[in-house]
Amino acid sequence: MTLPPCVVHEDDDLLVVNKPPGWNTHAPGPHAGEGIYDWLKHREPKWAQLAIIHRLDKDTSGLLVFGKTTRANRSLTRQFMEREVLKRYILVTDRPAQRDEFTVVSSIVRAGDHYASLPLTAGGERAETRFRVLRRAGERTWLEAEPVTGRTHQIRVHAAAEGLPVLGDALYGGSAAARLHLHAAELEVEQPESGDALRLAVPPDFSTPAARQLRDAVIDRVATDTFRCVQGAADGQPGRYRDRLGGWLLLAGENTPPLTEASALLGSGEGLPAVHGVYFKPLLRQVRKVPVAAASPHLLAGVVAPERFPVRENGVTFELSLTEGYSVGLFLDQRDNRRRLLRGHVAAGFPLYAEAPSGVPEVLNCFAYTCGFSVCAALGGARVTSLDLSRKYLDWGRRNFELNGLNPAGHDFIYGEVFDWLKRLAKKARLYDVLILDPPTFSRSREHGDFRSETDYGSLVSLALPLLRPDGVLLASTNTARLLPEPFIGQVHAAILNAGRRVVQEHYGPQPPDFPVAREEPAYLKTLWLRISGAG
């Protein structure tokens, strides 16, 4: 796989990225959305030792360097502590600068939810920032800021103290703007091995929307043409969602957007070929009770999509349809989990298979839907059994296999109830290297009654565990918003403990970065990857 677009430089010791605005350097909590550091660290085996040396505020964009080796970490830590690292930022303010060059030296102290610049006599940490006016354009002034020290919010605090708050910095008195106009534009460090200077520069982009910059940073448009473009309130558009599906856009919300808005999206490429058509579907709470035709998206503007059309994700081809009901054939928020199956790499220090299998690894995908997980596991070298209570979706899954040069005849597709077949397979003493559980939020059957993820997930795990080989991996996932991370994890762990087995490796995966998380748009997708010891 190619490097993520955010990577600016990589060598044996260093990884340098251009962080987009609105993305944390690291995750703010164990079950929150990943920061750019977490996302990179767990993405590639070669980045497993990635270390944070310095940080950028969530809303600040620009250059960020990570260490890849112990040698690099020691060298970079020394360089930052001895102030040998050159960092230059560019900021924009709408207040007039009276001087072309000036230096601010003060103590920066915490003051509630922000920081304050006080005289050095007040105590606290000494902070120094050099400022230089780059240009004046109308009411806006562009300045270069060079922090000599590295305190939290230092540039923002010092700019505000000089009467030049950063545009978009509401915390420190800046005028309202679409984003914080602060960018880490230049970085110079010493190469840990050679001692040579490494100097990198990335110009600021204060005009492209932050939502677009985030997707530009993580989506390789050559390998992937289907992803979430707008995630509601997390992207500043409460209650509104937009997906790119190859040549089509799918909008979702409470109310149908006006034709003028949909028409304006035609031709907008977002780094891809032009949009052919724009569809809309209302946000439905009870999809099961709505007829297929009524639940299916409807065209707002442009050209009607073919009944079936292909899209790309991480170089894998999937068939989608906008005429088969509420779901289009692929859950975009599971992209990173499909990549883990494709690459055979779960997270830092966590390979999918504990050791090279003596034969072909076996994977059981329950609630397989159109077999997206199955295709990626098969491309990763596994023999896959896909289990679902829909012949239509299993046939769809077979076509997905064929689209990727895989012969469906070399894999099993089982039609039937998952709960029933888990018992049958256990009686046959079948064992699998990987079990995939991604059940619907609610299901109902005559034999097994109602299943609700928020209360019954543990019982599903208990039913599946006898099929998992010792040191096999369980992928347990749910998009049930009402089931919070802690109770979900608790249910899964309790089932494993009750089965007399033990978790030896664990990774919690949130939704991917194109589904960003905010207070107004909380995380909903939860995934546990667990290597489990003990007999099946």
Protein language model features and the residues they cover:
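Conserved SAM-binding motif I beta-strand of class I
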Residues: 383-388
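Pseudouridine synthase
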Residues: 32-36, 40, 70, 110, ...
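S-adenosyl-L-methionine
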Residues: 390-436
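Non-catalytic substrate-recognition/targeting regions of SAM-dependent transferases
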Residues: 235-236, 242-243, 259-332, 339
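RNA pseudouridine synthases
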Residues: 1-128, 135-138, 179-181, 197, ...
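C-terminal catalytic and target-recognition region of SAM-dependent MTase-like enzymes
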Residues: 195, 473-536
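Conserved SAM-binding loop of SAM-dependent methyltransferases across substrates and taxa
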Residues: 370-382
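Mobile active-site "lid"/loop adjacent to the S-adenosyl-L-methionine
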Residues: 393, 415, 432-463
